[in-house]
Amino acid sequence: MITNRKGGAMEITNIETIPGKKITTHYGVVCGSTVRSKNAFKDIGASFKNMFGGELKNYTRLLEETRQEAISRMIQQATALGANAIVNVRFATSDVAAGAAEIYTYGTAVRVE
C-alpha cells in the first residue's frame, strides 16, 4: 500500500488481482517513466570500484530514486483516473543516450472493493 500525493492509498502489485479484493472497474494501462544520467565525477570513483569489485552504491541509489520517481508518476496517472489500485505492475529499462537510462513502469489501473 502506497500513499498517493492526494493522501489516498494506492495498492500496487505485480500479480493480476489484489488478494481478498474484487476488481470493480478497469481504467486501462497507466505508466510512469523517467530518464536519468550518471554524474561524470562519480563515474571516476565507480571506475575504480568496478576494477576491484563491490557494489556501486552511487548507482544503486540513483536507480532506486529513479524507480521511485517512475512509480510516483504511474500513481499520479492512476489517481487522476479514479483508481485505487494498480495490478500487473512491470518495470523496463533502456539506454536512451550515452550515460543515460530510462526506467519505465506500467500496470493496469483498477478500482477494488
Regions found by a protein language model. Give the residues of each.
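N-terminal presequence-like segments and the immediate start of the first folded domain
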Residues: I2-K42, A80, A101-E113
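Short, solvent-exposed loop/turn elements at beta->coil junctions and helix N-caps
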Residues: I15-I18, F91-V96
